[in-house]
């Protein structure tokens, strides 16, 4: 075991537990638990969004993909960044103005039917759980590699910590864990990027020229098609990334942590700059790993290339820099899973328990109790499923999370705000069509079926797309449209839609429910 890494891991755990202790003292109401009382500034929330969004897949996965596949690895990261243009121009302001705690609140501002809120809440729980299991499986494998801990023990450590942060600290603790993670990640990535760039004499021309001979791909390293050989697959994947982000519940609830829509927009702009700079720096990480660690050493440590960044740190700065990068990866995992637990728990406690079961009549104390127990339940379920999934290829869960978010959530968000004729039937059918089509298509994809036995089942996939976004997203919108136009309810509530338009874009009356 690398003792330096172990001590840095302990330091991060200690720091985050101290944050949780002070956050717990401030978390007395449901507003503070769900949204930190709306007290974050735009820059703070931007850092938290970046901390929530830049997962271990972003830090370790993309650096590894660039190191192994060059251009295709960087192109994969573009989808994550461009997604925030959709969030900025379509989602952030209406969501903040119409909702209160969850995504379902926004839909319920127009449609009062309990079944609509229930379906939206179940989508949130499903997306968060899929994503969380994938993160926990990755966490277990990563910590096992870095510290030599048993996989189950590693998952339990992360699981227990995320439960403590959410149950006791709520959104306040979650936000500050994410902010600290974002600062550490940016600092660590910047240091390594500068060192790598110095090795190339601070010359981009030199760097690109050397990369043509640094890998087995030769000059093709800088060209597309090394990993994604089917253009349709690339298009489908990036479509799901770009549109799926606008429907990810753990990202959406962050817009409730600020006081108004203007600050929500500032949050998105801040997050976009942070995320954009980060992904530019992953090029230096990937190129550096390819040049100074080498293809064989990277794949020997991890076939997918996830150890590229830590190995680069070790090559450049010895055990200390390796330990620092490993600790950042640990903080990255903690920040993301904490946000996922909170989004799933909020959907159950606020939408299902408080609004549907108790019909909005639950007391503040009852809501807080439900939220905390929901956090425990979500955490325990995810931990158990992650332990069970140790030997499985869980890449399909990430594809599924983004596909469901884009196919089931985004049609509801867009049509609720922008389509006058949209009705409850359309909302229900759009959500269900998107959810079911994403589930079915992913279950038939190469992420689940592989003739060589590299996926869950051995056999030929029924569809060639690992991420079915290019099919399931249009189906979600089509289901919402057909559900509306074929509905027996042909009435258009002009007054309600007019009020939604005013509230969505100005925030007028947004606190009056």
Curated annotation (Swiss-Prot):
Xref: InterPro entries: Na/Glc_symporter_sf, Na/solute_symporter, Na/solute_symporter_CS, Sodium:Solute_Symporter
GO molecular function list: acetate transmembrane transporter activity; symporter activity
Membrane topology: Multi-pass membrane protein
Coiled-coil region(s): none
PROSITE patterns (alphabetical): NA_SOLUT_SYMP_1, NA_SOLUT_SYMP_2, NA_SOLUT_SYMP_3
Domain of life the protein comes from: Bacteria
Predominant place of localization: membrane
Protein name: Uncharacterized symporter YwcA
Lineage, uppermost ranks: Bacteria, Bacillati, Bacillota, Bacilli, Bacillales
Name of the coding gene: ywcA
